[in-house]
């Protein structure tokens, strides 16, 4: 069965990371999962490996509200750099339903979706299956 090689979760909520890991593992659609507790640690990893395609995720679930570097700051850094892997799909995964965040989401055409927490196993399954079809 075809699988997504690498998925990343960037979120400071340990419970969300844990539950997401369990759900993603249960789908059996992902080879490897890498987790980051904030945008700063994530962008440092991305920049360190920007020329190593196999080290960069195919799919990212990005929280907006995190300490140190939030999701929007991560996206600013991410879009300002060139990565060897051109197609890194990013979904916003947040509890924010604010108009400001929704409008800002629309200003990033490369963002694939805006998912409101808590997310169900079915939502994750649909995202992963859709990415496999497109990949």
Residue positions per predicted region:
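Helix N-cap/capping motif at the beta->alpha junctions
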Residues: 35-48, 71
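Conserved active-site segment of CheY-like receiver
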Residues: 12, 91-97, 118
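Conserved acidic segment of CheY-like receiver
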Residues: 5-15, 20-24
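Short amphipathic alpha-helix used as the core "switch/output" element in two-component signaling
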Residues: 44, 72-84
């Amino acid at each position: 069965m075809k699988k997504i090689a690498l998925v990343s979760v960037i979120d400071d909520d340990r419970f969300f990371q844990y539950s997401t890991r369990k759900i993603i593992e249960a789908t059996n659609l992902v080879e490897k999962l890498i987790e980051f507790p904030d945008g700063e640690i994530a962008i440092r990893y991305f920049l360190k490996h920007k020329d190593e395609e196999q080290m960069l995720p195919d799919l990212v679930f990005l929280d907006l509200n995190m300490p140190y570097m939030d999701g929007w700051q991560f996206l600013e850094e991410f879009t300002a750099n060139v990565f060897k892997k051109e197609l890194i799909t990013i979904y916003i995964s947040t509890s924010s339903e604010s108009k400001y965040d929704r409008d800002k989401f629309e200003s990033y055409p490369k963002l694939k979706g805006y998912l409101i927490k808590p997310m169900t196993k079915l939502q994750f399954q649909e995202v992963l299956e859709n990415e496999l079809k497109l990949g």
